[in-house]
From Swiss-Prot:
Pfam families per UniProt: KH_6 (PF15985)
Name of the featured protein: Exosome complex component Rrp4
Domain KH: 154-220
Protein's cellular compartments: Cytoplasm
Family of the protein in this entry: Belongs to the RRP4 family.
Keywords from the named record: Cytoplasm, Exosome, RNA-binding
Source organism per UniProt: Thermosphaera aggregans (strain DSM 11486 / M11TL)
One GO BP: poly(A)-dependent snoRNA 3'-end processing
GO MF assignments: poly(A) binding
Function: Non-catalytic component of the exosome, which is a complex involved in RNA degradation. Increases the RNA binding and the efficiency of RNA degradation. Confers strong poly(A) specificity to the exosome.
Length: 247
């Protein structure tokens, strides 16, 4: 099946947007739904079935749903996982259609590709916390780790939640975040791309806090959630974090 693609790779589309025309099909395809690619075919036109980002690979085209993925914005705090180590940069999975780029000069002072092996600093699978320095949809987002508290994550645990649930995890004027930190005694860093970094002074508190976070994610739409989370933490921890926070 030969396609005439009329959208750009990684373009944002809406339901009903035409993505491509089928050429040399032999006969007209009146209607065919392709649910795993989130598109359907109507009169030899490939059409988006939802709001998402187009992924074009050769003669294959699909739409990645925006629900559950993160669209970068400048200055956002993000946590990424190193998925590729290059000669001059690392590629980070930031739970987005757009991979994050962390240049070696951000991590290695006086970087020289002839001297420095990037794997000696960050390797595949490492977690990194940083900020979106540049992003304009014409290029992959550039990550900076220059700043207090940024860089390789070497302690604690990283939990993933849907990016769309992050505002509920923070709460109005930080109410849910303050509840979680005060009652658990843990240090919590919430990244906009749906990763949460926890540093607790014991394993049990970390386990309970993860359960509370998953409860918030599951019931984000429900009223009275703050009180339910408070009761859950009181029951599991018996009185909160006693003000003990890690530096």
């Amino acid at each position: 099946m030969k396609l005439k693609v009329i959208v750009a790779d990684r373009q944002l589309v809406r339901p009903g947007d035409i993505l491509a025309y089928i050429e040399e099909a032999g006969e007209v395809v009146k209607f065919k739904k392709i649910p795993d690619k989130h598109v359907y075919i109507f009169d030899n036109k490939i059409i988006s079935d939802l709001v998402g980002v187009v992924n074009v690979s050769g003669e294959d085209i699909q739409v990645i749903p925006l629900e559950g993925v993160y669209i970068p914005r400048k200055d956002d705090l993000v946590i990424g996982i190193v998925e590729n180590v290059g000669v001059t940069a690392w590629t980070l999975d930031i739970r987005s259609p757009y991979p994050g780029v962390l240049n070696a000069s951000e991590v290695i002072e006086g970087f020289n590709p002839l001297i420095h092996n990037l794997r000696n600093y960050l390797d595949t699978g490492d977690f990194v916390i940083g900020r979106i320095a540049l992003f304009d949809r014409t290029r992959d987002p550039v990550i900076t780790v220059k700043g207090k508290g940024l860089g390789k994550i070497t302690e604690g645990v990283v939990v993933d939640v849907k990016p769309s649930k992050i505002p509920r995890l923070i709460g109005k004027r930080g109410s849910m975040y303050n509840l979680l930190t005060s009652m658990s005694g843990c240090e919590i860093t919430i990244a906009q791309n749906g990763f949460v970094w926890l540093k607790c002074h014991d394993e049990n508190r970390a386990k309970v806090l993860i359960q509370a976070i998953k409860l918030i994610e599951l019931k984000a739409h429900m009223r009275g959630l703050t009180e339910e989370v408070k009761m859950f933490l009181e029951r599991k921890l018996g009185g909160g974090g006693s003000g003990e926070h890690q530096a």
